[in-house]
Amino acid sequence: MKVLVLGASGHIGARLLEMLQATPWAAATGASRRMKNTASWLELDSRDPRQLAQALKGFDAVVNCVAGDAASIADGARALVQAALQVDCPRIVHLSTMSVYGPAEGNVREDAPLDPTLGWYGQAKCEAEAAMHDFVRHGGEALMLRPGCVYGPGSQLWVGRIGRWLQAGRLGDLGIAGDGWANLVHVDDVCQALLLALRLPAAQGKIPVFNLAAPDSPRWNDYFVDLALAIQATPVRRLGSRRLQLDAWLCGPPLKAAERALKLLGSAGIKLPDALPPGLLGLWSQHIHLDTQAASHRLGVQWTPYADGLRDSAAWFTAPAGAGQATLDKMICTP
């Protein structure tokens, strides 16, 4: 099977490409805006249907791991569908997110209604899913995965910046503000699910959808304390809601503005504190628990135990070239 991985320079895409290239059944090629010096790599703008159509010729499937801003996610998905239909690329495996469920709480299955009201990220992901439905209506095959918070080695979002906030005393035991379910899923488990989805039979006109989160994933407070102990960011502080609100709403916007300005200036090596996005305050207290029975039973995902994922994450964070120091090239402009 010839497989093209879009967004292959990102956290999940890069690991997926490694795992695909180790299989006996896949011939994998990576693609992103940043070219790598390898024969199995394409440089392209995933928002350009013409570039995508040229790149997709001859591929049996494409995995969409594109991240970034709203245009990259939503417009990129629409461009991908247009290109795949044009050149008869038969299958898209699309990486979505649990953010499409909005502020839902309780045990959430894949048939729960989508809600794009949490912000630009959830809105863009909902639009991308709509594009996949359009692809299927026109005769294509699509499968969608909705992971929770992807941690493990290489995760700047859910290990790197969390660890740095813990080291700085800006995060710890949040009390009721951190009592939501973390819905953590190891990056290798996401990639395992993508590999399985590439070969899963799909009924015509239907899109199989799978939530991804480890069944033993803890609540956010437990994860913060566990990670702090594992990286020796102790003592773990007990933080009140007022302190978090001030950090997110007063300090967050200017830090984010400075980060974006310095990136535009090409000053990627400058160290800045990580901005605390206000949206995370809602996530950490949201009692949403992804139901992953379909991924366990239909896909056959074998989940990484939380203790092993925590150990892997801490080892990566504390390694000499790990994530313990924040520089602009490590920062990711997503929620």
Regions found by a protein language model. Name each.
Residues 285, 290-297, 304-335:
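Amphipathic terminal alpha-helices
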